[in-house]
A protein has these predicted regions:
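Feature for peripheral, non-core segments
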Residues: 1-61, 65-182
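Single conserved hydrophobic/aromatic residue that forms the stacking wall/gate
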Residues: 181, 186-190
Length: 190
């Protein structure tokens, strides 16, 4: 009989590995994928089965905020620019115009790469909520920063309608409740 004691230093949470590959399509992060509303690309019934995040060649993890999808292009564009930035605002990865907008999350630590590297899984920070690692703290607390002020970064409009005037905008306060009803004289959210 054989046994080995495992400490918390040898345990990591993992997620399915989705490598960024030029010419591939990735899905937008949406929390409403279900049997009735599968993801457009992989037909996943759960968010965690959709390809909405990627691991780049430098072991940085990003979430896809936009993939250039439209009503006539529901699957989105192919991704041409590998995300490599580490600033906290969602950004384009390059100048190809592929329509992708990525949000940087974290970098897999070198020690985790050595201990846990796999072709099937990515390690994620074990203590995301309490970590004092400056990089994780910065990402975690970005939503509470005075710069970001918990902004909505992307709005998905299921049925855009027609007859709206371009260039009109209306500022509205969105309060965190179970739902929000907006009535705008310009009928447009920017």
């Amino acid at each position: 009989m054989f046994g080995k004691k495992i400490s918390s230093a040898n345990i990591r949470r993992i997620i399915r590995r989705v490598d960024w590959v030029a010419g591939s399509r990735y899905e937008i992060y949406r929390d409403d994928y279900s049997v009735e509303n599968p993801s457009p690309l992989t037909q996943a019934n759960r968010l965690y089965d959709a390809n909405y995040y990627v691991l780049n060649s430098d072991f940085k993890v990003y979430v896809c905020i936009d993939n250039g999808s439209t009503g006539s292009n529901p699957l989105g564009n192919v991704s041409q620019d590998e995300p490599t930035f580490t600033d906290l605002e969602p950004s384009k990865a390059g100048n190809s115009g592929d329509g992708y907008l990525w949000k940087y999350l974290f970098t897999v630590s070198p020690s985790d790469i050595i201990k846990f590297d796999s072709t099937e899984f990515i390690t994620v920070p074990n203590s995301w909520g309490s970590s004092q690692d400056s990089q994780i703290r910065s990402v975690r607390e970005n939503g509470d920063s005075s710069v970001n002020q918990n902004q909505i970064k992307h709005v998905y409009i299921e049925n855009a309608g027609s007859g709206y005037a371009n260039g009109l905008s209306q500022e509205v306060d969105i309060i965190a409740v179970s739902y929000t009803h907006l009535t705008l004289p310009t009928k447009r959210i920017v």
